[in-house]
């Protein structure tokens, strides 16, 4: 795509060297639009499927009035939020009150710059893609803290403190799990990590993906990912029965929609990261000798992301909410020690004759 736009502006339109630069900028903008529009639509219909799945598990119907089978319900929700008044507490900090939602949303969008959907579908293919993801997603906690403090509400501030402590705690466990993947892959480039999962003793099959040899750390990662996104059963930061929606409590209308959008985009991002790091990314679960269904493609990437997202919804509909002290105990006394211990075990495993990743 980049070469096509550069040729269009440089040769066809006769802009020379300037055309190469213009073509590069235009191609980047087009790629951003191609990523963001489907992403926002996915968020809209993820809310629909979430309500349908939870309704099914609770023997309810779910949305079924707005449009056929309730398919227009996400757009009705969007219009409702857009036209609701954005109220602000009289004693709140006006500037920070509006900066908070933006700071929560911006990192969720920016992280998609390095997520590949196959070997070619990526906005920026950099060698420190994983490090970039960890760095950029950790910034979203500042938006939560700012929103909680700027609202000048005890419930908002308590929810912000809970969310920030939980996010920072589980980032450690999740990072330890991802370090194990980097150790066996030898790279922080997502394309290289996916390619490494097609090699080894069981190369070319579903058993060569990182979820199986790293299964204990895969479980640590999945639990940490749910806690990192503040989803049930780790949603004490916005526990309706305890602190009345946490740092969201003073937000309404479009400002609340930004927090809502950030949460679901982050959830989709985690599902993409799970697919790339543990589930083989765009690699097919079938042998390549099976023809089309055995060919690596973006289709398999989307299927794996959908499976992880369904797991998120199943978890929310199944498990009760943990207490805050239980969440902290699970993170610091269970998951983090397991993560660091497995790094040592994996290092010894890789230098032993039983190395599976040669």
UniProtKB/Swiss-Prot annotation:
Keywords for this protein: Cell inner membrane, Cell membrane, Membrane, NAD, Quinone, Translocase, Transmembrane, Transmembrane helix, Ubiquinone
Intracellular or extracellular location(s): Cell inner membrane
EC numbers on record: 7.1.1.-
One of the GO biological process terms: aerobic respiration
Topology with respect to the bilayer: Multi-pass membrane protein
Origin: domain of life: Bacteria
EC supergroup of this enzyme: translocase
Cellular component terms per the entry's GO annotation: plasma membrane
Reaction equation(s) it catalyzes: a quinone + NADH + 5 H(+)(in) = a quinol + NAD(+) + 4 H(+)(out)
GO molecular function: NADH dehydrogenase activity; oxidoreductase activity, acting on NAD(P)H, quinone or similar compound as acceptor; quinone binding
Similarity field: Belongs to the complex I subunit 1 family.
Function: NDH-1 shuttles electrons from NADH, via FMN and iron-sulfur (Fe-S) centers, to quinones in the respiratory chain. The immediate electron acceptor for the enzyme in this species is believed to be ubiquinone. Couples the redox reaction to proton translocation (for every two electrons transferred, four hydrogen ions are translocated across the cytoplasmic membrane), and thus conserves the redox energy in a proton gradient. This subunit may bind ubiquinone.
NCBIfam families from the UniProt entry: PRK06076.1-2
Listed HAMAP family: NDH1_NuoH
Protein name: NADH-quinone oxidoreductase subunit H
Organism: Neisseria meningitidis serogroup A / serotype 4A (strain DSM 15465 / Z2491)
């Amino acid at each position: 795509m980049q070469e096509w736009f550069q040729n269009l502006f440089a040769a066809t339109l006769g802009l020379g060297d300037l055309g190469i630069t213009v073509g590069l900028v235009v191609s980047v903008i087009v790629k951003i639009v191609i990523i963001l529009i489907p992403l926002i639509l996915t968020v809209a219909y993820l809310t629909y499927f979430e309500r349908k799945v939870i309704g099914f598990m609770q023997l309810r119907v779910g949305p079924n009035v707005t449009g056929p089978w309730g398919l227009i319900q996400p757009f009705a929700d969007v219009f409702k939020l857009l036209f609701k008044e954005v109220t602000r507490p009289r004693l709140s900090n006006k500037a920070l009150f509006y900066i908070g939602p933006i700071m929560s949303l911006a990192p969720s969008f920016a992280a998609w710059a390095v997520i590949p959907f196959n070997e070619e579908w990526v906005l920026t293919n950099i060698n420190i893609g994983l490090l970039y993801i960890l760095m950029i997603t950790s910034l979203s906690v500042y938006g939560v803290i700012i929103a909680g403090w700027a609202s000048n509400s005890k419930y908002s501030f308590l929810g912000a403190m809970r969310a920030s402590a939980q996010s920072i705690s589980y980032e450690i466990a999740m990072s330890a799990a991802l370090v194990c993947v980097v150790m066996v892959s030898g790279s922080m480039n997502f394309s290289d990590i996916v390619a490494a999962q097609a090699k080894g003793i069981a190369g070319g099959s579903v058993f060569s993906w990182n979820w199986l040899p790293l299964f204990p750390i895969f479980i640590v990662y999945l639990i940490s990912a749910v806690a990192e996104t503040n989803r049930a059963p780790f949603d004490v930061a916005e526990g309706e029965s305890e602190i009345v929606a946490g740092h969201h409590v003073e937000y309404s209308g479009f400002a609340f929609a930004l927090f809502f959008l950030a949460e679901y985009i982050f959830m989709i991002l985690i599902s993409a990261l799970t697919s790339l790091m543990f589930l083989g990314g765009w690699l097919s679960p079938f042998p390549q000798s099976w023809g089309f269904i055995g060919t690596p493609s973006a289709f398999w990437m989307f299927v794996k992301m959908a499976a992880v997202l369904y797991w998120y919804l199943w978890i929310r509909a199944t498990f009760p909410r943990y207490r805050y002290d239980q969440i902290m105990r699970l993170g610091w006394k269970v998951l983090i020690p397991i993560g660091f211990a497995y790094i040592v075990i994996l290092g010894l495993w890789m230098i032993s004759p039983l190395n599976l990743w040669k």
